[in-house]
């Protein structure tokens, strides 16, 4: 359960309780020919750790998108996720925290995965591949009412694009 409050300046306060996600680690991921792509996003801590290990062992490519779950992990945990993942995506705030905790720059992280995407809100995003940064301009909104859910929309678009074989910059 999540409650997200946004003021007129787009400052957010989030309250989150994992509820049933605390049992998500019970679900096991096995190698299957019909699973082509996965995502590790905010979940119970144990589930995030175990599912990343299981996806790596099953050779299933996955996106590591820690979101609001990032503060649960120390630098060693986060470095392990990076090394297991195929791609990493974070927003600018999370990207700074990820770099601070791991001691890895965005360029460093991008050399350990196929790509790192750092979203910048209304400013678009940075796509890092092999240490090189490409700035992708934003799609201008006709009007912004509430940014709640933008991260979920981003995840869906990213997964769709990866499944289609599109480049990260597309």
Q: What are these language model-derived features?
A:
Residues 1, 47-48, 155:
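Short glycine/serine/threonine-rich phosphate/pyrophosphate-binding segments
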Residues 32-33, 82, 110:
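A short, aliphatic-rich alpha-helical micro-motif
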Residues 1-37:
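Conserved N-terminal subdomain of the carbohydrate kinase-like
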